[in-house]
């Protein structure tokens, strides 16, 4: 029996990187899948790659109204939802003097407010024993240079996974978190790092990881798959760190 056979699933930020790979693994395990994205090109590519059975929707994680619309679309498509992987996010690393209020608010809107209000909007849609997986980051634990706002958003999401686990347990909703270390994904490419400097930065980052390399979306998706499946039914409010040992070097 496939691990997610017949499960109705939602993956936000599912058109590239960890989200796209998770969608592929969910499909391989028998799930029905909805993914969201914001970039039209990425949406089109994901639709072509995942096939016609997958519903690919545009949804801006920064918009509370969009989260309500997404929850309604999920209800219309499935009736109820068994699994939600809330993966949509942005990663901006800057020194404190370069931050503006607009940039600060955008980071918290996408990374914190969006998933919070999506969970709220999905409450009437969740099936009994639903599983929610939040994508956080080892940045929630590590005081890395220039990561102040990004790390704060991920620490908020990690705490949300614990506090909402307690609050929603009586409703039969399990919430857990996966915290990746440095992973080779398009999100990393969007940091605005000059190409000439990127190779050196990659080597410097890899040197902080005991296993000596970046992780892959496939490796993170396997942890998400476990938390989404009934195999993790006794796991509530927990965090799976997938970081190649990065936290050993705090």
Name what the model sees in each region.
Residues 119, 153, 161:
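Active-site helix of classical SDR
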Residues 97, 142-148, 170, 212, ...:
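Active-site loop immediately N-terminal to the catalytic Tyr-X3-Lys motif
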Residues 8, 15-16:
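Conserved glycine-rich cofactor-binding loop
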Residues 137:
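Residue(s) in the substrate-gating loop at a strand-loop-helix junction
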